[in-house]
Amino acid sequence: NLDPENAIFINAYFPHRLMSLADELNSKLIHISTDCVFSGTKEMPYIEKDFKDGKDAYAKSKGLGEIINKNHLTLRTSVIGPELKRDGEELFHWFMSQTGQVNGFTQAIWSGVTTLILAKVVDWAIEHEITGLYHVTNNNSIDKYSLLCLIKKYTKKNISIIPVEDKKPNKSFIDTRNELDFIIPSYEVMIRKMIDMMLQNKEIYEQYESNSARK
């Protein structure tokens, strides 16, 4: 949102350029989009055909960049997971870098998946004839307070999470196509398996070791 011109180029123009290159190579493009294409004002979870009513430059540019046709695939979701860069900025990295206590918003609703699950879905999509638009979710939702509590539980991080009832946009979404041949697990299972994966690959995620009680 700080650089709308750059956002339009990267989020809106570039995916379509990639699509053209994929067409030339007779290949399928798998593009990742976001729940931020929605404003969060709908009273029920968003489905694939809902109007993309996000208002800011990021939302509009991501919406324009979605590739929805019979040859390519857009996976619309939201993700949480560890980052390779030390100055990460997403929720998991932010939480793991905090000390003392943090706020957890009980009315900030989330329907996404871990980066580990998204990788599994992408791997599956490469091998299967699935195209168009697909919502990657377990068709449930969780509030950000409960999500942080799960991360605390499985990392054994010494931190207090204060529940805060602050009204937030509800961008929850569901998958109405149901074409995956495996079940996306519960949030507790997703977080547990993600932390297990990190412990099995400590050399990659060593930046998080000092912020976790699990070694």
State each model region's role:
Residues 15-16, 63-67, 120:
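Conserved active-site helix of classical SDR/Rossmann-fold NAD(P)-dependent CH-OH oxidoreductases
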Residues 1-12:
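NAD(P)H-binding glycine-rich loop region in Rossmannoid oxidoreductase-like domains
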Residues 16-53:
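Conserved Rossmann-fold NAD(P)-dependent oxidoreductase catalytic core, especially the SDR/UDP-sugar
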Residues 121-173, 202-215:
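Mid/C-terminal beta-alpha module of Rossmann-like enzyme folds, strongest
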Residues 11, 58-62, 76:
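Active-site YXXXK catalytic motif of short-chain dehydrogenase/reductase
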Residues 55, 67-112, 116-117, 123-124:
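NAD(P)-dependent short-chain dehydrogenase/reductase
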Residues 4, 34, 77, 138:
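Short acidic donor-binding/metal-coordinating loop in glycosyltransferase active sites
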Residues 30-33, 73-74, 111, 135:
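Structural signature of the Rossmann-like NAD(P)-dependent dehydrogenase/reductase core
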